[in-house]
Amino acid sequence: MKKICWILCFCCFMTFWNAKTSVSYAKEGQVFTYTVNQQALLKFLNSSSNEYNNTMKQGITLAEFASKKGIDEAKLIHYFAIEQKTQLDIALNKGEIDPQMYQDLLPDIHHSIYRTIHYNPNSK
């Protein structure tokens, strides 16, 4: 019984911790959303809009699609990191986010890009 109680307490603690940490760096009203420049991405991938959309509908991830186009994962991550950093810089300069939020978001860029390029909601 004690083990179950400790496990439940630990699970509750972890749930609370994870729910709290994802927004703890953001002050009220601060939101940063990365917006993909679709035309620039298609140019980088050397792809047409139809080819890209059809591939995504088939459940292929962006990393797999880029690989078929001869672009390795590191280049793809670097491309998105530069794009996101540029948008973060603009948001900081416009006052949409503060320096603390900017500094808190930077370390997670590569990890979030990695998750994104390896995810496709249409995959089986």
Residue ranges and their predicted role:
Residues 3-14, 18-124:
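Mature extracytoplasmic/periplasmic regions of secreted or cell-envelope proteins
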